[in-house]
């Protein structure tokens, strides 16, 4: 939605968005996008509550429950990811958009963070710190909570994230002409 920079700066409240979208959703019950947005706003608040509950534990490699995690500090792999030189066009397109704008949609953020932490096995905190330095909508709670979730060390891990199924991701990717244009 690109509300995130406004939310991060306090110019717009999540409550206001929630109430407006809820009203729209009630008037247009078939709108799936409204339901998704409502869910994302609730998830945002969940991450805030969990971040304040667990506080500094979110910054540990093993996250809030101090899980054992296989990861490496591979700065060459990190640079490959940052410079959009991975083997995957979808990841590269998202990273190029991020480098050029300081913003990335939520699905892209989920995929690139999971790719770095699960496919490349790079310490998720390094990716989170990179995002912290680049995001135009940076929010400490949301950034670290989202990264921890995708690395499998957050609070909401009923299902352990695994490496991304890149063929399935690529199939979705090639349906979006915007990403193909970014790669040209």
Residue ranges and their predicted role:
Residues 1-184:
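C-terminal catalytic domain of photolyase/cryptochrome flavoproteins
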